[in-house]
């Protein structure tokens, strides 16, 4: 009876693993399409504005990231990745500010300036009126970043599923008597 339950669990984990692999392949194809679309839109923008108008010479001297990758690990060791826009606070950052002492009496303090103001839109490096294709390129690459984070989470889940499947198969081998 235990062997039957173990086989059912192996089947469930295997089906889940195959579903995750199918999702990963679909996301890879979508990522490839977004990146290809982004580069094509970027080349259209270079054609519209001139080859020297869209290039490294227009980049800001000091760049700030617009997104970060957030990670978390669940109790079973499964990691999850997601995109966090710059300027938004994570729960850890909010909690640390509230724990600070407050001065209730005396001179009013001047508010502390934010150490990290929201970063400027990089499209403004290329002028005020940028072609629509440049905006499309930016949107395509942003979607690609989100897909990459989703793919990393899926890959982590696939690795976890493979280890679960191997453990279950080892248990199943120990339960079944060896036939000559």
From Swiss-Prot:
Gene3D superfamilies: 1.10.287.3240. One of its GO terms (molecular function) is unfolded protein binding. Residues 89-123 are annotated as: Disordered. Residues 13-38, 152-176 form a coiled coil. One of its GO terms (cellular component) is lysosome. It is found in: Endosome; Lysosome; Endoplasmic reticulum-Golgi intermediate compartment; Cytoplasmic vesicle, COPI-coated vesicle. GO terms for biological process: cellular response to increased oxygen levels; intracellular iron ion homeostasis; lysosomal lumen acidification; lysosomal protein catabolic process; vacuolar proton-transporting V-type ATPase complex assembly. Keywords: Coiled coil, Cytoplasmic vesicle, Endoplasmic reticulum, Endosome, Lysosome. It comes from the Eukaryota. Accessory component of the proton-transporting vacuolar (V)-ATPase protein pump involved in intracellular iron homeostasis. In aerobic conditions, required for intracellular iron homeostasis, thus triggering the activity of Fe(2+) prolyl hydroxylase (PHD) enzymes, and leading to HIF1A hydroxylation and subsequent proteasomal degradation. Necessary for endolysosomal acidification and lysosomal degradation. May be involved in Golgi homeostasis. Accessory component of the multisubunit proton-transporting vacuolar (V)-ATPase protein pump. This is Vacuolar ATPase assembly protein VMA22. It comes from Bos taurus (Bovine).
